[in-house]
């Protein structure tokens, strides 16, 4: 086996990057152990949405009460029905006595202040859910789309599982405390990502800072919308049991981070801690496109082939999340049998891109033959064998 440094890689990484590499579905993601940050949140999960790289996590798979962050799923269910045409923003729904009693002002929870018996446009209800965090608005929609709020919550759970939220169970549409109403920080981050990618046309509601309904003006409880860090969503949550939580997304250039925190003691903590974690994620990391899909990494010698060389290409785009202080530790090589015997079919896996970082297992990316190489005929093979014997040539 021969270990070769790819010529394209050497020129691109002349400064000997120590990189954090993400693979999706075969690009890798890893962070060197030296990178560390602490948080006062009980649960936290921070990812780069473009690469999927996990930048930080704390108890990310620990079951937790999501409180009003549950409403992201309620809104997602509405978005799906708007997309398939079964609902329109102009549709109206009647406020039931149940929705008023369970979600209105007397309930003690966040509310849109809906009046029983009144018909309300869906777009107003949607803003009531997202901007005002109205429990009454959630219940009105749940009762309209299912036989009851409980039945709607069952549909929410089923759909959440289909989206990949494997550790999430909804018992209501609002996030009202229930011992079985649980999720994880990682699941909420996935839901946020799906919301942003699946429903770009509706995502703007999460960035709205206020909404006035029935002459009552309420501001969005997301404190990061009022800070200069380009946050454009998503949802806060708070109960006595879960304390203060937030699912947030922010952009910086062509990067987007998603952060989930929960179990913060005060509103002030919910304002400061997410801002600190997001700033860290943008400041200490960057994304780097190493190879495009189908790009040639290097070439290899061919034995007994009609061509002397075969290009080695990477099948899919390789996008890196680089930790700025994780440089000067990474080694990148390409390994393959040298020379590679013909015949070679285009697309055959014939080499490996090997990435090593101190303290981590070796990570390997397959490289494919970028062209077909036919085997020489009998006389050609004899001539090649003779040259190899007499002069040591292997072409």
Residue ranges and their predicted role:
Residues 1, 22, 99-103:
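Short regulatory "switch" loops immediately downstream of catalytic or recognition motifs
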Residues 1-14:
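N-terminal secretory signal peptides that target proteins for export/translocation
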Residues 16-30:
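Bacterial N-terminal signal peptides
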Residues 25, 46, 94-95, 207, ...:
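Hydrophobic/anchoring residues in structured secondary elements
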Residues 34-186, 193-197, 211-214:
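Active-site-adjacent loops and short helices of periplasmic peptidoglycan-processing enzymes
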Residues 165-169, 177-395:
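Domain-terminus/edge residues, biased toward the C-terminal soluble/receptor-binding domains
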């Amino acid at each position: 086996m021969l270990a070769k440094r790819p010529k394209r890689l050497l020129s691109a990484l002349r400064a000997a990057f120590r990189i954090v590499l993400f693979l999706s579905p075969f690009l890798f993601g890893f962070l060197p152990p030296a990178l560390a940050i602490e948080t006062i949140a009980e649960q936290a999960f921070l990812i780069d949405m473009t690469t999927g790289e996990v930048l930080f996590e704390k108890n990310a798979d620990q079951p937790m009460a999501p409180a009003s962050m549950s409403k992201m799923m309620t809104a997602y269910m509405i978005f799906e029905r708007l997309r398939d045409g079964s609902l329109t923003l102009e549709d109206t729904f009647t406020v039931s006595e149940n929705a008023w009693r369970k979600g209105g002002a007397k309930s003690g929870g966040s509310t849109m202040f809906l009046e029983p018996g009144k018909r309300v446009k869906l777009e107003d209800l949607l803003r009531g859910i997202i901007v005002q965090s109205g429990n009454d608005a959630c219940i009105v929609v749940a009762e309209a789309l299912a036989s009851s709020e409980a039945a709607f919550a069952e549909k929410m759970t089923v759909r959440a599982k289909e989206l990949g939220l494997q550790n999430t169970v909804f018992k209501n549409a609002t996030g009202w405390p229930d011992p079985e109403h649980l999720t994880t920080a990682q699941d909420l981050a996935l839901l946020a990502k799906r919301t942003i990618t699946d429903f770009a046309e509706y995502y703007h509601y999460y960035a709205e800072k206020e909404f006035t309904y029935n002459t009552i003006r309420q501001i969005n409880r997301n404190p990061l919308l009022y800070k200069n860090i380009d946050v454009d969503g998503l949802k806060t949550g708070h109960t006595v049991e879960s304390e203060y939580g937030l699912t947030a997304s922010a952009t910086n250039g062509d990067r987007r981070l998603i952060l989930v925190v929960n179990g913060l003691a005060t509103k002030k903590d919910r304002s400061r801690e997410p801002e600190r974690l997001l700033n860290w994620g943008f400041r200490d990391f960057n994304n780097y496109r190493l190879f495009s899909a189908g790009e040639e990494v290097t070439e290899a010698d061919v034995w007994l082939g009609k061509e002397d060389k075969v290009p080695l290409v990477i099948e899919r785009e390789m996008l890196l999340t680089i930790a700025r202080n994780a440089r000067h530790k990474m080694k990148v090589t390409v390994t393959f049998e040298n020379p590679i015997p013909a015949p070679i079919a285009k697309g055959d896996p014939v080499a490996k891109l090997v990435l090593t970082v101190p303290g981590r297992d070796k990570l390997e990316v397959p490289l494919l033959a970028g062209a077909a190489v036919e085997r020489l005929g009998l006389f050609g093979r004899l001539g090649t064998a003779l040259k190899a014997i007499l002069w040591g040539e292997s072409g």
